[in-house]
Design a protein with these regions (language model features):
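Hydrophobic alpha-helical transmembrane segments of multi-pass integral membrane proteins
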Residues: 1-559
Length: 559
């Protein structure tokens, strides 16, 4: 029926190359606007609970915690997941040397995924409608869509014509980890235990979101910069570390797991035994190995490529650089907060929410959005509509997130200090700082709108790419001229590979002297070769001149 439809209806099932990836990425950018709006509104309602009181006449009572939950669902499942899955629909076929198994399936499933996120957002505001829990329904729809995505990617990998690079395996393992961890959590009873809920939340974050985001970011960093990945070993460390360690990013509780699994989970207070505390702290500290491996690999691969805003061929590099730089300091802060929760001290619980939002908008969103922007020209065949709008989008999102969340965290520290000193009256300065922080975070909303409009408009009005951009490393991949003693590590770090041919250049360390013109004429100027034109079998041809021909020529010139 859709094939016979006019306009967009037929486009959905036409199966054009790259249509599935484009559909996921464009919907992910639109979710970025809603995610930033929900997060900004929740921050504003924190210091002004009655700001949206007029909506009560329509039956909607705005609550800061509920809107914050909606912002998390829209950010993780609406924006980040769709950007990662959409980028994966382009990356895995490229690395496998084949085409996506079904572009039509990828295109249609994107709308099913969007519908599941809508249900999750609605459930975050009112989880019980007509006696039915809404969030588990959204989770079930999301699982069906993810199952279709996994089948599509597995069929694509099955038809590969060459071995797939490690970033592709990172994306594939991220997709497979979601249903596997869900089944394991249900069978083991982890969803019905407070510690199990906390553990499931962070395992989902590490295996699904961290692995998926790092996979697309590593691929995009190599494509955008034109440099090969600095170290394949570090990619392997990132791959195994995302599975075998506990990711410290995110909330310090398992409320999301409890909401997602609905009747299978009970509301429990997080309480760790001494053995659980030691194991969790050790595995979270161990997570710094893949985090450092990813950050160093990204930064070295992208060396000298942070000026994307002036070149339409390199969109997204600034976002990728931002995420790679900030992942380590935010991970350190998250480790302190999570360890504080695990140990039961709860002295840093006041900054947990701000740090969780910071990890979303300064690490996960920039990396996933930067990867999508880097793949944009190849997916659409056009440049972004406006480089200036891309530059302003980056500056507004980055400046708004850093300044707004940092100021909000300062207010959190002030409130924590007042609680510790048992001061009952709230601080007026803290309230003012929260107002300033929420106003600054509004820049993220504006930046999201800039990016989304720029990408959607660029698809129709962006400058056509006349020829494929030629990306090269700092040295030629085919050859490398060795002019001085150098280690193999330095040669490989410069962009060479195992197939690069190294040519040693001879050096003479003797004392230099002036070269005479006579010596130069004898040794440096190559001899001139003469040819004689003659007629052979009725056709004019050429042969090398011999001594007789030269003597004859010289005698004729003398006469």
């Amino acid at each position: 029926m859709l094939e016979k439809a006019l306009g967009p209806g037929s486009d959905l099932v036409e199966g054009r190359p790259g249509s599935g990836a484009r559909s996921w990425i464009f919907q992910g950018t639109l979710w970025l606007i809603l995610a930033s709006t929900f997060t900004f509104t929740s921050m504003w309602l924190t210091h002004d609970p009655h700001a949206l009181h007029s909506l009560a006449s329509w039956g909607f009572v705005a609550n800061a915690d509920e809107l914050a939950s909606a912002g998390v669902y829209a950010t993780l499942y609406g924006s980040v997941s769709m950007l990662v899955i959409g980028s994966g629909f382009h990356i895995i076929p490229k690395l496998a040397g084949t085409e996506l198994a079904s572009e039509t399936n990828a295109n249609l499933v994107s709308f099913v995924w969007t519908m599941s996120v809508l249900v999750l957002v609605i459930g975050s505001q009112n989880n019980m409608i007509f006696g039915i829990e809404i969030i588990p329904i959204g989770t079930a729809i999301n699982a069906i869509a993810l199952f279709a995505v996994i089948l599509n990617q597995l069929l694509t990998v099955a038809n590969r014509t060459r071995s797939m690079a490690l970033p592709g395996w990172l994306i594939l393992i991220a997709l497979l980890s979601n249903p596997l961890l869900s089944v394991i959590s249900i069978i083991s009873g982890a969803v019905d235990d407070s510690v199990g809920q906390w553990l499931s939340y962070h395992l989902f974050g590490g295996a699904f979101f961290f692995a998926g985001v790092t996979g697309v970011a590593l691929y995009a960093s190599s494509i955008a910069s034109g440099n090969p990945l600095w170290s394949k070993s570090l990619v392997g460390v990132t791959l195994f570390g995302s599975i075998l360690t506990i990711n410290p990013f995110g909330d310090n509780h398992g409320q999301m797991v409890m909401d997602v699994f609905g009747p299978l989970a009970e509301n429990n207070v997080v309480a760790f035994s001494n053995q659980d505390m030691l194991a969790a702290s050790f595995l979270m500290a161990l997570a710094f190995i893949p985090i450092f491996a990813f950050a160093s690999n990204m930064l070295v691969t992208m060396r000298g490529s942070d000026v994307f805003v002036d070149s339409p061929n390199y969109p997204g590099n600034a976002e990728l650089n931002l995420g790679a730089w900030l992942i380590v300091p935010i991970a350190i802060g998250s480790l302190f907060v999570q360890t504080d929760t695990v140990s039961g001290t709860s002295e840093l619980v006041g900054i947990a929410d701000s740090l969780s939002v910071m990890s979303l908008w300064l690490i996960i969103v920039p990396l996933s959005l930067g990867a999508a922007l880097s793949l944009y020209p190849e997916l659409t065949g056009r440049h972004l509509f406006s480089n200036s709008r891309a530059r302003w989008g980056y500056l507004m999102m980055t400046g708004g997130a850093i300044s707004g969340l940092s100021i909000t965290m300062i207010a959190d520290f002030m409130d924590m200090a007042l609680v510790e000193m048992m001061v009952e009256d709230p601080s007026a300065l803290s309230e003012e700082l929260r107002k300033v922080g929420s106003v600054m975070f509004y820049g993220v909303v504006i930046g999201s709108i800039f990016h989304s409009l720029n990408m959607v408009t660029g698809m129709f009005r962006g400058e056509l790419i006349s020829q494929k951009s030629v990306k090269s490393s700092s040295i030629s991949v085919e050859s490398y001229f060795l002019v001085s003693p150098m280690t193999v590590r330095r040669i490989l770090a410069s962009g060479a590979s195992l197939d690069t041919e190294v040519y040693p250049t001879e050096e003479d360390n003797g004392k230099g002297s002036a070269t005479s013109l006579e010596q130069l004429s004898e040794s440096s100027i190559p001899p001139t070769k003469l040819y004689v034109r003659y007629k052979k079998e009725g056709k004019w041809t050429w042969r090398p001149a011999d001594d007789t021909d030269i003597d004859k020529y010289m005698s004729e010139q003398g006469n």
